From Swiss-Prot:
InterPro entries: PX_dom (IPR001683), PX_dom_sf (IPR036871), Ypt35_PX (IPR037917)
Highest taxon listed in the record's lineage: Eukaryota
Quaternary state and interactors: Interacts with RBD2, YIF1, YIP1 and YIP4.
Keyword Glycosyltransferase: no
Main location: membrane
Residue ranges, compositional bias (Low complexity): 38-58
Chain span(s) of sequence motif PxP: 5-15
Family of this protein: Belongs to the YPT35 family.
Topology relative to the membrane: Peripheral membrane protein
Keywords: Endosome, Membrane, Phosphoprotein, Vacuole
Listed name of the protein: Endosomal/vacuolar adapter protein YPT35
Cellular compartments per GO CC: endosome membrane; vacuolar membrane
């Protein structure tokens, strides 16, 4: 983050039910409009080929996408946000991102531990992530651009509301809708095995644990 920030208030705004730590992912319902999802390492799966020549694997109830030899992405959880102070009296929301990992090796799986990555991101970080993913696809394999569609992010504040930007952007209902949109976006990305394989370095950099500035 470019701004020098201080976290206020001490406790994050709760936008989610704390009991719902493993939300149900409804990716199939939006797959037709958003592009294919590929997955692996699941017990209940069916596969078919799409028009782009890629294999789509539908799995229930678990999906995962390999990030390295040891772990696969299992799901992402965008939870409560914290309102922070930036320069010049501005305020913005920082989201807590938790990505759950599934061990690929029996040695890790036998430990029955919960493997996860946790970091903090602003909406603008998601915007840059999407831009970087699109640039990578266009540069590396432009013919795959239609097959590896990147879902849209939840909208930013509309121009006609810019005069009350702070009020709109920090509204709890607005933030709750943004949380759901960011969570869908991130899950769509990390559960697409073809996309992960092509953009692994970009995703790893995005998920690098953040240092919170007091």
């Amino acid at each position: 983050m470019n701004d020098k920030i201080s976290f206020l208030p001490p406790e994050p705004i709760q936008l989610l039910d704390e009991d719902s730590t493993e939300p149900e992912l409804d990716i199939d319902s939006q797959q037709e409009n958003e592009g294919p999802i590929s997955a692996s390492n699941s017990n209940d799966s069916t596969s078919h080929s799409n028009d782009c020549g890629a294999t789509i694997t539908r799995t229930r109830p678990r999906r995962s996408s390999s990030i390295n030899a040891n772990f696969s992405f299992q799901k992402a959880h965008v939870s409560d946000c914290t309102i922070v102070n930036g320069d010049h009296g501005t305020k913005f929301a920082v989201w807590r991102i938790t990505v759950f990992l599934e061990p690929n090796l029996k040695a890790f799986a036998a430990k029955r531990e919960s493997y996860k990555i946790q970091t903090y991101k602003r909406y603008s970080d998601f915007v840059r992530l999407r831009e970087n993913l699109l640039t990578r696809i266009k540069t590396a394999k432009p013919e795959k651009l239609n097959c590896l569609q990147i879902p849209h992010l939840p909208p930013s504040v509309q121009w006609y509301s810019s005069w009350k930007y702070q009020e709109v952007n920090l509204n709890k209902d607005w933030l709750a809708k943004r949380q759901r949109g960011l969570e869908y976006f991130l899950n769509h990305i990390i559960l697409n095995s073809s996309l992960v394989e092509m953009t692994k370095d970009i995703l790893i950099q995005f998920l690098e644990p953040s240092k919170r500035v007091a």
